[in-house]
Curated annotation (Swiss-Prot):
Species this protein is from: Homo sapiens (Human)
Subunit text: Interacts with voltage-dependent calcium channels CACNB1, CACNB2, CACNB3 and CACNB4 beta subunits; prevents their interaction with the CACNA1C alpha subunit thereby negatively regulating the activity of the corresponding calcium channels.
Biased composition (Acidic residues): 344-353
Entry protein name: Voltage-dependent calcium channel beta subunit-associated regulatory protein
Biased composition (Low complexity): 383-397, 591-614
Segments on the Cytoplasmic side according to the record's topology features: 67-705
Transmembrane helix listed as a keyword: yes
Amino acid sequence: MQPTATMATAATTTTTTTATVALTTSWDNATGRPTAEPDPILDNYVLLVVVMSLFVGGTLVVLSGVLLLCKRCWDVHQRLNRAMEEAEKTTTTYLDNGTHPAQDPDFRGEDPECQDAETERFLSTSSTGRRVSFNEAALFEQSRKTQDKGRRYTLTEGDFHHLKNARLTHLHLPPLKIVTIHECDSGEASSATTPHPATSPKATLAIFQPPGKALTGRSVGPSSALPGDPYNSAAGATDFAEISPSASSDSGEGTSLDAGTRSTKAGGPGAAAGPGEAGPGSGAGTVLQFLTRLRRHASLDGASPYFKVKKWKLEPSQRAASLDTRGSPKRHHFQRQRAASESTEQEEGDAPQEDFIQYIARAGDAVAFPHPRPFLASPPPALGRLEAAEAAGGASPDSPPERGAGSAGPEQQQPPLEPDAERDAGPEQAQTSYRDLWSLRASLELHAAASDHSSSGNDRDSVRSGDSSGSGSGGAAPAFPPPSPPAPRPKDGEARRLLQMDSGYASIEGRGAGDDTEPPAAPARPRSPRAWPRRPRRDYSIDEKTDALFHEFLRHDPHFDDTPAAARHRARAHPHARKQWQRGRQHSDPGARAAPALAGTPAPPAGAARPARAPLRRGDSVDGPPDGRTLGGAGDDPAIPVIEEEPGGGGCPGSGLCVLPSGSVLDKLAAGLDERLFPPRLAEPVVATPALVAAAPTSPDHSPA
């Protein structure tokens, strides 16, 4: 049967339907059931990540273990090395056994700012006294190698004096505990509190008393605030702790305070600390540190100026720095030693030393000390000191009491007044209360300016608290001179304040050397003991003759003031150029600048006096001939006559070229020369003819010969 179109259409429709059904069935199969197993590629990635993480973690654990092991080995190695050859830069402070709890020897500060933490702990444990720094090799005289300087110790001044005394007197004291704080070189701050018996061979040398008993008066006068220094006497033990707690030392200083007071810190200058208020408890460490920092911020000057760590800052006013300005390396050690051991000076920005002087004025008669040694017998270690304020002394003609027992404040601390003629000597005496060092200096300079400089010698009586200013006595000696060397005071109750003038070598108070020639006067006593002078005030000025002589020798140039002002200022602005000019100049003729004035003139006659500007011989002064060739009397013309010749040949009378002076003029000239050569003849002075006398220039520098 032939297929027709209708059948073909039906077949096509059937085929299409079958295919559609099949497609639908397969699609349903693909989406209907889930995937049985994941893709194998993804499974490989997960396995790799897990293995890598395990490997990295294990590596980190092993590395950290190795590093910890190395660090522990390095610590042991460092400890052994430190035991054999000591670390160079250490700062050592000495502590009492009972004052501070022993720290753990294995303590390691891990914070990155180990320097600050260690410094704070060191500052809180150490005392704030003046520092004395020295070398261990220099102390024990056993420098093994020249490059090995040994450990450098820094003690307080009290410890230093105790060390010196302990070498002489055998004190039965417990051994030291030494806290050594090394610099933070490695990452840790090692603070080992072990008492190194092997490192320091004299570690058993004891410096401190045990905390139970106070200091004996054997080696130290108990009046000294810094032990061993009888000149900076502050007060007794409890009085000093009660009145001025800001000056009490912290721990390591062997002051005459109780051990409880040592561990106590007052919160400010006003609070009072009794001796038994706070015992040395174990929990006082952080509180002590906090109170230390609070006190350091609250008080005026850290502590009071005598109990402050000396800044090793060399200023040009200190002599150790001014002796050589740049400081050669050979002098660095000496400069550091000197700056450390010299007494603290008042720096520029420091607050005035008011609290200490107020304390001395308040203490008055209430505080009694054993009297210090005779003042000039053993001079203090610092060079020049000046006695600024003295508390009440004993009732005797040598040291009369200056004020009553109940004096309050430094306003009543008046300087000693001279007798009645001196009582109205001017307002600069009536109101003098030395607030600090600088007002003391100002008052000294006022006295020096008010006095008569040219009265007599330098030391004698040119300044005696303004003695010649108010009285009509001129340059006479003071009416009631004090005893010749100041005798040691008979009474114990006296507190001294010794200030160091920055002039370097201000001499200790006493009579000058020239005063021994004075006949001892027997003066009548004034009415009241307050009018007696305590001690002559030192004259810091020099008289005009010495001053002029010093300046002449200083500059080797008699005509220095004749130069124009611009050149002079230029020379002062460049002192090295001036010194080079001097070096070439000092062996040449000092009168060379006056040579153009006398260039056209011949030498004067042989018998005449030398011109003033001839080269100076040894022993001549600048402005005039020496004593053997003194000038004429009061009526003489001070100009030196010089004969002026007209230009012409020697055979002048034969040739009519020159005009001879008349006979009367020659007579006058001869009379003038006669008058110059024979000065005792003073009857009628002859007025020299101006045409024939030339005045040689004299320098305006009128320093007496």
